[in-house]
Curated annotation (Swiss-Prot):
Protein name: Spiralin
One Pfam family hit: Spiralin
Assembly and oligomerization: Seems to occur as dimer, tetramers, and large oligomers of identical chains.
Organism: Spiroplasma melliferum
Function (record text): Major membrane protein of spiroplasma.
Gene field: spi
Post-translational modification: Palmitate and stearate are the major lipid components.
Subcellular localization: Cell membrane
Length: 242
């Protein structure tokens, strides 16, 4: 009996040990270590571009840092965390930088605000390249993703929808909002006027939902974004009610 208990004890310790290892390797969903990138601001407002201060840098970065944190905890607010700006990935203190001469790389670290538990842990030192004074950095939207959208349009004959009727997909309210929200996650300064939405829907029967490909492309004259991305939408047509 003692021998059996000894064997069980050994297995018990082993099982607990294994469980502990798994638990230690698991990253909590609200851990700031999940934040891997922070978008650069389009511009940095500074009273003296040759000696941009840390407070001016932080002001330019605030919106993008909040977006990055909300990518981990959607309900997080600016009061739930704090961040610091450094010269390098070793945490060397920063006082001023020269954005008159050109772009400058800085490093950010985000930690929870004192006595707050909405987020935990901390980020590594995340590199952000600040734009030269007077230049505006466009954000490439090629990696933006939008989940498949469900779209309902009106057509005079749902079994024979015309191309111009399919243009309603591009301005469908929930689809357009999903696109804008997704873009602003990486380019907070972007607006609806910075891009155009098109789709490849072919004329035909849309009484039953049919999949179309939607393309979102930055306008050439946009000061905030560049590039394009695509996603799917399921489109259904119904006749207008009299």
């Amino acid at each position: 009996m003692k021998k059996l208990l000894s064997i069980l004890a050994v297995f018990g310790v082993s099982a607990v040990g294994t469980t502990s290892v798994v638990a230690c390797n698991k990253t909590e969903s609200n851990n700031l270590s999940r934040v891997k990138t922070i978008a650069a601001p389009a511009t940095v407002a500074a009273s003296t571009p040759k000696a941009v201060t840390k407070p001016e840098i932080k002001t330019a970065l605030e919106a993008n840092v909040l977006k990055a944190v909300q990518g981990v905890v959607k309900t997080a607010t600016a009061a739930d965390f704090q961040f610091e700006v450094y010269k390098n990935s070793k945490g060397t203190a920063l006082e001023t930088i020269d954005l008159e001469a050109g772009k400058v790389e800085v490093y950010l670290q985000i930690t929870p605000a004192k006595d707050k538990t909405v987020v935990i842990g901390e980020t590594r030192y995340i590199k952000v390249t600040l734009p030269k004074h007077g230049e505006v950095t466009k954000v490439d939207i090629k990696d933006v993703t939008v989940t498949e959208q469900t779209v309902g349009i009106k057509a005079s004959t749902p079994k024979a929808v015309k191309k111009d009727e399919l243009n309603a997909v591009n301005t469908y309210a929930t689809l357009a909002k999903a696109v804008l929200d997704a873009i602003q996650n990486i380019a907070p300064n972007a607006g609806a006027s910075d891009f155009e939405i098109t789709n490849n829907g072919a004329e035909g029967d849309y009484e039953a939902a049919k999949e179309v490909e939607v393309t979102v492309k930055a306008k050439n004259d946009s000061a905030n974004i560049s590039g394009q991305f695509k996603f799917k939408a399921k489109v259904t047509a119904t006749a207008p009610t009299e």
